[in-house]
Design a protein with these regions (language model features):
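Universal eukaryotic N-terminal targeting presequences
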Residues: 1-27
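Glycine-rich beta-alpha loop segments
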Residues: 23-185
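Solvent-exposed alpha-helices and their adjacent loops that cap or buttress functional pockets
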Residues: 73-76, 149-154, 176, 196-199, ...
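Short, solvent-exposed amphipathic alpha-helical segments in soluble enzyme
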Residues: 98-100, 176-177, 239-244, 271-274, ...
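Phosphate/pyrophosphate-binding betaalpha-module
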Residues: 158-227, 238, 263
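Glycine-rich phosphate/pyrophosphate-binding loop at beta-loop-alpha junctions
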Residues: 176-179, 186-201, 245-249, 253-279
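Active-site/ligand-binding-proximal alpha/beta "capping" segment
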Residues: 208-257, 307
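C-terminal functional extensions of proteins
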Residues: 257-317
Length: 317
């Protein structure tokens, strides 16, 4: 039997012919030598097409949740005083120039209702001018105070904003005038294509998702200053005080509202209490201020009190 099994192999060797399996092996090797290798596939995490696709949305969200924390940690930022307020506010000289331009445009074509409306809106915003100055001065005072504390080895605080123009720019500029750094948590919007120039470049962020931006504006927040603003400002304000009310933020942050008349008129806090929608405690946590000094005193008292509480000393979850 062994001889019979061996015979075909011996026969093929004798005749010089190849078995089918040998022919396939030789053919495959020849083809591989002739075919050029294609480009090396791109790794998924390096693929711009994939990372910007619908399928990678969760990955983009995770990036916006993780990257800011890494950057802030690298720069030693752990306690932030957040400033919210209208992007429409302007310093006096800029406001007056904007009014002159709007007046000229409206006068050139009295039938242009859009131009007339733009002028009317600008004129209504004149009350923001002194508050712009208050916010800028308050941010400057806060930064100077924090820098003195840092030099003494005490807890330091950084000014943070939404990174845009208006009241946000006022706060970032105030911090810069004091010689300090400040944060800008920007958001990509069709009518704002860059952050204001006073944000510290290393602490400038641009978010795509509002919820990740709002997370970082509240996560390291140890005090809140809110200047007059519209829907966006109110959204940010209510986000923070709701997190406090529900215990998601486990510390009683000082909440300073700049412009008592504006905030008392815009939101009827007393009516909320009278109808049982919020408690006296909820309303009483709001501090109204009209001057930078008044706001500064309340802010310092609030944040230093937090330093003495057990919750403030715990690592945030």
């Amino acid at each position: 039997a062994a001889a019979m099994l061996a015979a075909p192999s011996q026969a093929s060797q004798a005749t010089g012919t190849k078995r089918p399996c040998e022919e396939m092996s030789t053919s495959a090797g020849s083809d591989a030598a002739e075919v050029e290798l294609g480009p090396k596939p791109e790794k998924a995490y390096k693929s711009s097409d994939f990372l910007n696709s619908k399928g990678a949305r969760m990955i983009r969200m995770m990036c916006e949740l993780q990257q800011p924390g890494t950057v802030l940690e690298e720069h030693g930022v752990d306690n932030v005083i957040m400033f919210f307020g209208s992007a429409r506010a302007k310093p006096r000289a800029q406001y007056e120039q904007a009014v002159r331009d709007a007046e000229a445009k409206a006068a050139a074509d009295p039938s242009d209702t859009r131009a007339q409306g733009a002028l009317a809106r600008l004129q209504k915003q004149a009350f923001l001018i002194p508050m712009f100055d208050v916010v800028q001065e308050l941010a400057k005072m806060t930064t100077e105070w924090s820098m003195r504390r840092a030099a003494q080895g005490k807890v330091a605080y950084s000014v943070g904003t939404g990174g845009g123009p208006g009241m946000m720019e006022a706060a970032n500029k105030g911090a810069m005038l004091a010689g300090g750094k400040s944060i800008g948590f920007g958001i990509s919007l069709p009518f704002e294509d860059h952050l204001n120039p006073y944000v510290t470049p290393d602490l400038a962020f641009e978010f795509h998702y509002f919820f990740t931006r709002k997370f970082w504006m509240s996560y390291k927040c140890m005090g809140l200053v809110v200047a007059p603003g519209g829907l966006g400002t109110c959204d940010e304000l209510f986000e923070v005080i709701t997190l406090m009310q529900t215990g998601k933020i486990r510390r009683s942050l000082p909440v300073i509202l700049i412009g008592k008349q504006f905030w008392k008129s815009a939101i009827n806090w007393d009516f909320f209490v009278q109808t049982g929608m919020i408690s006296d405690e909820d309303a009483n946590q709001l501090i109204f201020a009209d001057t930078a000094q008044e706001a500064f005193d309340a802010l310092v008292a609030g944040v230093t009190a937090l330093e003495c509480t057990p919750v403030a000393s715990k690592k945030k979850a």
